[in-house]
């Protein structure tokens, strides 16, 4: 009887978490979309009514572009998550060399790394591998690395580190950027966490890490974030070497 009660409690907690996640997702999409389109409409009407001159109009375009990019990222993140909610979604494990992941992101982030003079390094066994869903893992690492670049200062280093312990592979993205104050760490996966600007004014969307945690669970793994203000952040993924 106790086992059945415990199982029901776990199911209730899981459903409550899913409902909370979906409600938060709808709230973010609604708020951000209204804000962005409201800004677009105001800017166009101001230009039509000649209450803003062309110089001020063009000066505001970089901010509008930044807001549009942020909202596009929110939609892309939401779409990625929604695909995992379809009834026929299944993990598709394939063998992945960790060094291949490094080279993939080294190429993908080449322009951003160059722009901020950041060096990207690999630490670990170049022959290390794991068998898991490549799309989900790449999404997770992409969001973590994106934050590392965003919150690193020009000239700093970022590492993708691999460590294999028995049947477990630990992948860590390590930076020495602005870090996160301890008071914010406990809320890092909630919808109440603050959204910080990157070191070059980049905007966060406040959603990616919530989806990252969800995807890591789908990969039957765990995520750990260790961070200190002005000392950098280490985000580690604890994954099974073989995922069924």
Across the structure, where does each feature detected by a protein language model lie?
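Conserved micro-motifs of the catalytic ATP-binding
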Residues: 86-91, 129-132
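Conserved catalytic submotifs in the C-terminal HATPase_c
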Residues: 92-96, 114, 119-128
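Short beta-strand/loop element within the Bergerat-fold HATPase_c
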Residues: 155-167
């Amino acid at each position: 009887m106790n086992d059945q009660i415990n199982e029901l409690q776990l199911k209730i907690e899981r459903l409550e978490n899913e409902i909370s996640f979906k409600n938060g997702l709808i709230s973010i999409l609604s708020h951000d979309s209204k804000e962005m389109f409201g800004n677009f409409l105001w800017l166009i009407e101001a230009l039509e009514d000649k209450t803003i001159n062309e110089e001020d109009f063009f000066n505001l375009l970089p901010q509008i572009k930044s807001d549009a990019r942020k909202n596009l990222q929110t939609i892309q993140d939401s779409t990625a998550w929604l695909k995992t909610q379809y009834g026929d979604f299944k993990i598709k494990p394939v063998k992945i060399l960790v060094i291949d992941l490094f080279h993939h992101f080294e190429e993908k982030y080449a322009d951003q790394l160059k722009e901020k003079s950041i060096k990207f390094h690999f630490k670990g066994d170049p022959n290390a591998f794991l068998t898991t869903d490549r799309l989900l893992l790449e999404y997770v690492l992409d969001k973590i690395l994106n934050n590392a670049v965003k919150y690193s200062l020009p000239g700093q280093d970022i590492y993708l580190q691999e460590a294999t312990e028995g049947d477990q592979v630990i992948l860590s993205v390590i930076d020495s950027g602005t870090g996160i104050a301890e008071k914010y760490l406990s809320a890092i996966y909630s919808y109440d966490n603050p959204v910080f600007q990157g070191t070059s004014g980049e905007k966060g969307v406040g959603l990616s890490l919530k989806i990252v945690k969800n995807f890591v669970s789908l990969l039957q793994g765990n995520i750990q974030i260790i961070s200190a203000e002005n000392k950098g952040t280490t985000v580690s993924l604890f994954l099974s070497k073989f995922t069924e």
